[in-house]
Amino acid sequence: LFTLVPQDATAVLETDRVADLMEDINGLHCSKDDHFLYVSELFAYLKKYLNTLVGDTPHGLSRQMNKMLISFHEPDTPLNQVLYCSLGSGDYELVESFVRKYCSSTFPSKYFDYNGEEIRIYPMADGRFLAVYFTPDFLAVSFQKRLIEQVIDARRSRQSLMDMPSFRTMYAGKRNNVAATVYVRMKEVGMGKDTDGIRSQTRLGSWAEFDMKFNEEAVY
């Protein structure tokens, strides 16, 4: 999935057990008090409809569908994120019927061609629109059509986040004993003075990773 993430992402949330992650969040005392742990608008949508989606499958989510990323982009607003999900056998049809089931009937869905790839725009009941990029192997969803276009560009040009040496060097793959991992782009820090010649071009700035664990009292 990281081969889909545009290189300008400022942070990425990764999990390979999204259903368990939702259970962990629902088990927090703050969730039981109706104080939802905010991650993103897309994550809030996922949390709202996940149980219904799981209910539509006889054996729960597939191993592939449990793999999920959310990338965050500038400017930092609730709508500037992309959710990515792997798809296994039969998942394409499941997700397609699920989206159609819950999208608004007020406006018809629209289809756009972008560099030979199809972007679908689904109207939602709250008046917003979801841009979706489907393939048999994955889907990418965003409230911003331009971000889905960037996903397509990253995939076709092979210039994704995983193609950046600074990220690829840091990335070690998902650990099995954590609910999720957050990757954050650190701001660059200039070293030396402008008059120091080559030293002034030295920059400190890369990626950091933080593993997330949950108990009823806290996220750490």
Task: Write out the residue ranges for each language-model feature.
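A conserved glycine-rich beta-strand in the N-terminal activation segment of trypsin-fold
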Residues: 125-194
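Generic recognition of long tandem-repeat/solenoid scaffolds
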Residues: 117-123, 216-220
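Long, internal scaffold/assembly segments composed of regular secondary structure
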Residues: 197, 201-220
